[in-house]
Design a protein with these regions (language model features):
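Conserved cytochrome P450 catalytic core segment spanning the I/J/K helices
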Residues: 118-196
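Short, small-residue alpha-helix embedded
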Residues: 192-205, 355
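Cytochrome P450 heme-binding "Cys pocket" and the immediately downstream C-terminal segment
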Residues: 30, 208-211, 321, 328, ...
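Cytochrome P450 catalytic-domain helical core, especially the substrate-recognition surface
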Residues: 1-62, 76-133, 223-225, 397-399, ...
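C-terminal domain-closing interface element
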Residues: 107, 237-253, 387-415
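Cytochrome P450 I-helix active-site segment
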Residues: 18, 39, 77-80, 84, ...
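Conserved cytochrome P450 K-helix/beta-meander segment immediately N-terminal to the heme-binding cysteine loop
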Residues: 250-253, 273, 290-322
Length: 415
């Protein structure tokens, strides 16, 4: 699957990230206008970002139009099925814990009722339709059509790589194996990015000086439609994204299951409850190994006494201890590391940068409720909720004000 997530492929998809970010910007502008014409209004940014990133993974991943940003009456069946299956109000069960250790179960919720079963059946059917359509196109034409992201959607790229003539038959993925990737792409490719961007807007709301500094840098780009290279050329935007993903990793922990006995060396000796000093850990086959992503990302021994503070400037000179963290990106464990690191980290990073580029240039953000009202619920992905109204589910209301109104106000006062 690696060819579908390389830098060249993500460069092709950047237009989708930017176009959907602009669509979200315009939707927020329209939403603010409906709030009695006030200069600023409240928006649940988590809900909107979740819909935007679902649209992106549908279009960039499968050439499928979720239309999640559109009005409810335009919602399609796959959007409804996805919302049903991945509801944040799912109950815990034994399968919940088994998913932590078995990747094949991780993104497949337990079917508790007829509605969930019907939703899963819809996802399977539409997934097969997408799969068969892409396969037929490749088999009959021998090449990808220039429509639909110029043939660069992830499913088409995955099938193209899988059907390459130089791939031995025993290394090819079966249709069932390819189909099984679709729920994983949908969940991992949309929940994590929307949550990460939500925490970014939260951090910027709490730190207006950082928000202003970022907006000043973003304003140096003269177009509303930046390329991937232009997004990656902005050092403070990169620092903000790094700091958000360090302090607020969407997935706070993970687990691995050992398939054979192994030895884990320790960088610092550990003394157990019996007083025995260990310089390494012997791990038996079948042992779950807990990976404390959030704890490592906030460890004062690595990041200093201000490790809990949101300070993008720390990335101008990262601490020496961070260089030893074996993450696939950014000297942190947010995207894990090694051969089972997050395969879509480039996808997520560029999408997040496109969102912040578009939204921070267009709006000013402030907390919509006192900071102490905002709690964190963690079930695979950590999301915000309001302590005063937990029954309402995950949300993050922010005060949102068009930035242009601030400029016009200053010009008016000057004259």
């Amino acid at each position: 699957m690696n060819p579908a997530f390389g830098a060249a492929q993500i460069r092709e998809l950047t237009d989708v990230f930017v176009e959907k970010s602009i669509e979200l910007r315009d939707a927020w502008d329209a939403e603010l206008r409906t709030q009695q014409g006030e200069a600023e209004g409240k928006i649940d940014v988590l809900s909107w970002l979740s819909r935007m990133t679902l649209d992106v993974i549908g279009q960039a991943g499968f050439n499928y139009q979720f239309n999640a940003l559109a009005n409810g009456e335009e919602e399609n069946e796959l959007n409804r099925a996805f919302s049903t299956i991945f509801s944040s109000n799912m109950e815990f069960s034994i399968i919940t814990f088994l998913r932590l250790g078995f990747p094949s179960l991780r993104w497949v919720p337990e079917m508790k009722d007829d509605g969930s079963k019907q939703a899963r059946a819809t996802m399977d059917r539409v997934g097969r339709e997408l799969l068969e359509g892409s396969k037929k196109n490749l088999q009959t034409s021998g090449k990808v059509e220039k429509s639909a992201l110029k043939g660069r959607d992830i499913l088409t790229l995955l099938l193209r790589a899988n059907m390459a003539t130089d791939v031995p038959e025993h290394q090819r993925m079966s249709d069932e194996e390819v189909l099984a990737q679709i729920p994983t792409f949908l969940a991992a490719g949309h929940e994590t990015t929307s949550t990460g961007t939500t925490w970014a807007l939260y951090a910027l709301s709490e730190n207006p000086q950082v928000q202003k500094k970022l907006r000043d840098e973003l304003s140096t780009i003269s177009t509303d439609n930046p390329t991937m290279d232009e997004l990656n050329s902005l050092p403070y935007l990169d620092a903000v994204v790094r700091e958000v993903l360090r302090l607020y990793p969407p997935v706070p922990f993970s687990e691995r299951l050992t398939v054979k006995e192994d030895v884990i060396p320790l960088s610092v000796p550990v003394t157990d409850r019996n007083g025995k000093v260990h310089e390494y850990l012997e791990v038996p086959k079948g042992q779950f190994v807990f990976m404390p992503i959030l704890s490592v990302n906030r460890d004062k021994n690595i990041w200093g006494e201000d490790s809990l503070k949101f300070r993008p400037e720390r990335w101008e000179s990262p601490p020496e201890g961070a260089s030893a963290i074996p993450g696939v990106w950014g000297n942190m464990l947010t995207f894990i590391g090694g051969p089972r690191a997050c395969i879509g980290y480039r996808f997520s990073l560029v999408e997040m940068k496109a969102l912040l580029f578009t939204l921070v240039r267009a709006f000013e953000f402030e907390l919509g409720v006192p900071a102490e009202e905002i709690g964190v619920s963690s079930w695979i992905v950590q999301r915000p909720f309001l302590r005063s109204n937990p029954e309402a589910g995950n949300q993050l209301p922010l005060k949102v004000k068009p930035f242009t109104s601030c400029i016009l106000k200053l010009l008016y006062e000057y004259h």
